[in-house]
């Protein structure tokens, strides 16, 4: 291991929404994230391993065991990469699990599902409600109500309680 960098980010957002009916909705949104980046050098190759995690909670999320596991994972990944062969190229099936792939889906598909894009009619999905826009077997769900998860909230930015919503 040649170099280790750890980055801790923490924020607390306080929001208050007033609607036209005079209803006030408030929320406090803590968010914390720790990233561990390791550079390993072996046989003339320098490779990187990254691990970490976060949640909508406070510093208590980072137990000694959890942080050590992230560090070990980053080291393992960096060292393993120094021995890795090039990945095959070409078209192949991809399976995405829960968690971070949600960011990829959000960037690739999610922005086109946001209300402002539909209001401006700039989304590829404009006018597609009720139509199939993905192959059978593909389901994309937005669930902002999962406790403690980075994308979870008590209420959205309009003051509406979050829920599980099937997008596609």
Pin down the residues of each PLM region.
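Long, well-ordered mid-to-C-terminal structural blocks that present hydrophobic/aromatic surfaces
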Residues: 157-168
């Amino acid at each position: 291991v040649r170099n280790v960098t750890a980055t801790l980010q923490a924020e607390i957002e306080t929001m208050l929404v007033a609607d036209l009916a005079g209803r006030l909705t408030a929320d406090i949104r803590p968010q914390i994230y720790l990233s561990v980046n390791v550079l390993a050098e072996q046989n003339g190759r320098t490779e990187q391993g990254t691990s970490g995690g976060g949640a909508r909670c406070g510093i208590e999320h980072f137990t000694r065991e959890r942080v050590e596991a992230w560090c070990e994972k980053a080291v393992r990944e960096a060292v393993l990469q120094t021995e890795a062969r090039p990945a095959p190229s070409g078209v192949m099936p991809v399976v995405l699990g829960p968690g971070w792939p949600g960011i990829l889906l959000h960037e690739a598909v999610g922005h086109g599902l946001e209300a402002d894009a539909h209001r401006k009619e700039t989304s590829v999905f404009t006018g597609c409600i009720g139509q199939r826009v993905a192959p059978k077997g593909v389901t994309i769900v937005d669930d902002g109500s999962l406790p403690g998860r980075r994308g979870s909230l008590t209420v959205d930015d309009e003051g509406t309680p979050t829920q599980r919503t099937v997008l596609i």
